[in-house]
Amino acid sequence: MEYKFGEYGGQYVPEVLMPSLKELEKAYKKYKDDPEFKEELEYYLKQYAGRETPLYFAENLTKKMGGAKIYLKREDLLLGGAHKINNSLGQALLAKRIGKTRIIAETGAGEHGLSTAMVGALFGLKAKIYMGAVDVERQKLNVYKMRLHGAEVHAVQSGSKTLKDAINEALRDWVETFEDTHYIIGSAVGPYPFPSMVRDFQSVIGKEAKKQILEAEGRLPDSIVACVGGGSNSIGIFNEFKQDKEVKLIGVEAAGEGLDTDRHGAAILKGKKGVLHGMLSKFLQDDDGQIAETYSISAGLDYPGVGPEHAYLDEIKRVEYAGITDVEALDAFSTLSKTEGIIPALESSHAVAHGMKIAKEMDKDEIIIINLSGRGDKDIHTVMNFIEF
């Protein structure tokens, strides 16, 4: 477990949080390789969440692009509609092991809030979800589902009323309640041990994808593409391929209305080093070094920073990062829906858009895997404003 990735990561937190982080680190080290814990997690991932997910050859999309073979890792088929359940199940089982009776979470697109509400119901843990008021408005369906599972949803009215503000509130809660509460951070962000732990729970994506592509093609892919907000779905699929230097790894950030505007969420492409939410990483900042307002059509990609491992992988040039605009993401949303009968989440549509773009430039015997991190049901209301029939 990495305390830091190069200079990124660490624990930049108030003293009062150190005991809970130490307790969590100790518990995670104890259980992560414990056969009983692993068996229980595997049981729930398979029987409850629906793993393993298919690696689907998108034949129609491949033909339409006229280049590389495109495979989709179908995390959108999991219970709750996204990859988030992989991590929520792992952390909830850990919370139970250390005697916590309450769980809290932050959420942007509502997917992580939903998966946390689900595991709260499953394991009899009281759940409270913090969500920016702006996101509550644009993700009504997920908010309703969370409440249906018995979770309390708190609409955060401070700051930009989006994900970063929800994290601030959740951290405040945890400072006061950590004796009986576990904070299930939803992305590979935050103070150590969260980035390593979330990556480990999400790495099941890459482990499966590697096995599946070897079965399907007898070799590794040429490129893997995944969207990056905080960066958990991407680190989950990249992790298993980090050592395979011949595999190009591409993280796709939200370019919003354009990288030359101030309305985007591209923390790696346009951010600077800074400290927020307990970690040193790359963040979008204004001229005074304050955290800048972010923007993306997709609620899950408007975090103003990125997980510390991504900042490091960018620095050592192991992962290439690209930006996709709202317009390009909407086009990919529509294209995948029409050509394959699969409606992707707006977050995942950013990865699909970039995958489509590079597939055209590649040879027909080359292979791309796109991580389809979630499905688009939650985004239909947003998309209706842009795509009309």
Swiss-Prot record:
Family matches, as SUPFAM superfamilies: Tryptophan synthase beta subunit-like PLP-dependent enzymes (SSF53686)
Catalytic activity: (1S,2R)-1-C-(indol-3-yl)glycerol 3-phosphate + L-serine = D-glyceraldehyde 3-phosphate + L-tryptophan + H2O
Recorded metabolic or biological pathway in which this protein acts: Amino-acid biosynthesis; L-tryptophan biosynthesis; L-tryptophan from chorismate: step 5/5
Gene3D superfamilies linked to this entry: 3.40.50.1100
Quaternary structure and interacting proteins, as annotated: Tetramer of two alpha and two beta chains.
InterPro entries: Trp_synth_beta, Trp_synth_beta/beta-like, TrpB-like_PALP, TrpB-like_PALP_sf
UniProt-listed NCBIfam families: trpB
Gene Ontology MF terms: tryptophan synthase activity
Gene: trpB
Cofactor(s), by name: pyridoxal 5'-phosphate
Protein name: Tryptophan synthase beta chain
Species per Swiss-Prot/TrEMBL record: Methanococcus aeolicus (strain ATCC BAA-1280 / DSM 17508 / OCM 812 / Nankai-3)
Pfam family, one: PALP
PANTHER family the record matches: TRYPTOPHAN SYNTHASE (PTHR48077:SF3), TRYPTOPHAN SYNTHASE-RELATED (PTHR48077)
Highest taxon of the lineage: Archaea
